[in-house]
Amino acid sequence: MITKRIIPCLDVKEGRVVKGIQFLELKDAGDPVELAEVYDREGADELVFLDISASHEGRKTMVDVVEQVAAKLAIPFTVGGGINQLSDMKTILRAGADKVSVNTAAVLRPELITEGAEFFGSQCIVLAIDAKYDKESDTYKVYTHGGRKKTDWEVTAWAKEGVKRGAGEILLTSMDSDGEKKGFDHTLTKLVSEAVPVPVIASGGAGNAQHMLEAFTKGEADAALAASIFHYKETSIKEVKSYLKEYGVNVR
């Protein structure tokens, strides 16, 4: 039986962890290195860091953060945000990250996925997808530029394309559910989980342990990601894992 993973996410802006609702209204949530250590101790399976101030200045800060985190962590971690070329991947992986996550840059130039997978292996390449329900077409559309720009890609088509090019994992965020704490978008998660043969991480909407359970049972996700409920101590990784075990979910 496959072990399901619980992954805290740290959105990092100018060296601090922040959290918002539907990609807006950002609030400070602490120091990334301190939070990473706490989550490692609490039993997180992995961590995801997203540099949301992915300017040149943001990148320099992020490399420092990655190096500091790598020195303290025993669990794998993924870094994304502003990774536009192979050299960016090299910089982040050399700084100590285990995987890199690509989003906007991959939509603009899908070869980036291929280049990364060929150079580092698929296990290092995570395709992050921000998706939102589109009433007009009755499909989920892919968005770029931090959720600001709608693309023509339908979510499963883009996920399949990314996997074909070598992405080893999909980090799938529901923009409709992000920060709302009302549960993941199971329709979206299941759609993508069934469309691709690689692990799918459900993201956007975690408000409690039951939501995490449903990401696995209803959404068929391989991992569930959460931010604010852990940052603001509304629940702990330990509590989530013991709840999942009660319901027969295989966790570490």
From Swiss-Prot:
Q: Which SUPFAM superfamilies match?
A: Ribulose-phoshate binding barrel (SSF51366)
Major subcellular location class:
cytoplasm
Domain of life from the UniProt record: Bacteria
Enumerate the UniProt keywords alphabetically: Amino-acid biosynthesis, Cytoplasm, Histidine biosynthesis, Lyase
Its BP terms in the Gene Ontology are: L-histidine biosynthetic process
Q: Which Pfam families does the annotation name?
A: His_biosynth
- Provide the reaction this enzyme catalyses: 5-[(5-phospho-1-deoxy-D-ribulos-1-ylimino)methylamino]-1-(5-phospho-beta-D-ribosyl)imidazole-4-carboxamide + L-glutamine = D-erythro-1-(imidazol-4-yl)glycerol 3-phosphate + 5-amino-1-(5-phospho-beta-D-ribosyl)imidazole-4-carboxamide + L-glutamate + H(+)
Known pathway: Amino-acid biosynthesis; L-histidine biosynthesis; L-histidine from 5-phospho-alpha-D-ribose 1-diphosphate: step 5/9
Locations listed in the record: Cytoplasm
InterPro entries per record: Aldolase_TIM, His_biosynth, HisF, IGPS_HisA/HisF, RibuloseP-bd_barrel
Q: Where is the active site?
A: 11, 130
Q: Which one of the record's GO molecular function terms can you name?
A: lyase activity
In terms of Gene3D superfamilies, this protein maps to: Aldolase class I (3.20.20.70)
Please give an example of a GO cellular component term from this record: cytoplasm
Hey, which family's this protein in? Belongs to the HisA/HisF family.
| Assembly and oligomerization | Heterodimer of HisH and HisF.
Protein function: IGPS catalyzes the conversion of PRFAR and glutamine to IGP, AICAR and glutamate. The HisF subunit catalyzes the cyclization activity that produces IGP and AICAR from PRFAR using the ammonia provided by the HisH subunit.
Q: What is this protein called?
A: Imidazole glycerol phosphate synthase subunit HisF
State the taxonomy lineage: Bacteria, Bacillati, Bacillota, Bacilli, Bacillales
